[in-house]
Amino acid sequence: MKQCISILISGIMIVAFSCKVNAQGCVAIRSTGGICTMDHHSEQMDTAQKWEFNLNNRYFKSFRHFVGTKQQKQRVENGSEVINHSYTLDLTLTRHLNKWWSVSVDAPILANSRSSLYEHDGKNRFLTHSFGLGDVRVSAYRWIFDPAKSKGNIQVGLGLKLATGDYKYQDFFHKNDSTVVLGPVDQSIQLGDGGTGFTTEINAFYSLSQSVSAYGNFYYLVSPREQNGTSTARGGTSSATSIKIGSNVMSVPDQYMIRAGVNYTEKNLTLSLGFRDECLPVHDLVGGSKGFRRPGFILSAEPGITYNFKKINIYAYVPVAIERNRTQSVADKIQTKLTGVYTQGDAAFADYTVNVGFTTKF
């Protein structure tokens, strides 16, 4: 029974480690790093395995535009859609201090490309890119209940998200046949958000039977900084309208994720099916919410598979979007108030995200 629970929880938390709120497109929910260290007590009490390393690969392609929940199908039909390709390599090292406490550090490496017409001359499609270290996160975790005495448990975590990613990354924009300007790339492919943030996590599991368990994860990033000063003019001059509504510089938004689901384990193989909600809210909990942001959320069904090789777990999880919603931003609301005409911007979303990786103990 203990071994089954151990495999189940390892499979559950591998993805909690590596899938902390990440974008599926222009809603710029980027990798914030992080591993939660929830393993079963039989592994936690093994003093010979105090270290844990997780490597996660994440990829998505976003190209379907939404205003609210309404898809703008004409964007794909007329070839004006924005296409983002996003790859993240998350490297996370965890130290188990004892059966109660653990600490971790995560370093995401990002490689992004963005293809569009409107950012350039409006007629031809060009690419902008970004590559480098993202925002590093350090965290501490503790079990609520004694891991040795329960078939379910709750783990809480607090962390610090550092502004290590370049939030003013630049590339060239083609304005016409003879003019190319250098400017900050779109917010959705910036390597960081420029703010120091604070994270809180709750991770839980409960074994329903020898083979079936339930899990849940909650993650929230608090970003006190309101704006990071990065221009949204792509190397040009900000318009009077963008300055008036505050969208001329990039915002530093909060973000959160909620996951819940069930797992079925047979020997070393675990199959899971869950629900996932990723959100970049309109308003932050702390600090202001002005500046340019594309708020919204993605609701996904999340199937997954994990296989245990004693000290190594390999896994694949593929959240598939079932609802995408680009909500009205603060800048949209200000413009609506100033003009009397309802304004709500769009955002491009992916159909699915691929997460593949492994965790090993030593």
Predicted segments with their positions:
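Bacterial Sec-dependent N-terminal signal peptides
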Residues: 1-26
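Outer-membrane beta-barrel biogenesis signature
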Residues: 21-68, 72-74, 145-155, 163-168
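Residues on the lipid-exposed face of transmembrane beta-strands in outer-membrane beta-barrel proteins
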Residues: 43, 55-57, 91-95, 105, ...
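Repeated loop/turn-to-beta-strand initiation elements of outer-membrane beta-barrel proteins
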Residues: 51, 101-103, 147-149, 211-214, ...
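Surface-exposed strand-loop-strand hairpins of Gram-negative outer-membrane beta-barrel proteins
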Residues: 59-88, 119, 188
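Outer membrane beta-barrel transmembrane domains
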Residues: 66-75, 221, 226-362
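Short sequence motifs at beta-strands and strand-loop junctions characteristic
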Residues: 80-86, 128-134, 190-196, 250-254, ...
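Outer-membrane pore/translocation modules
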Residues: 112-249
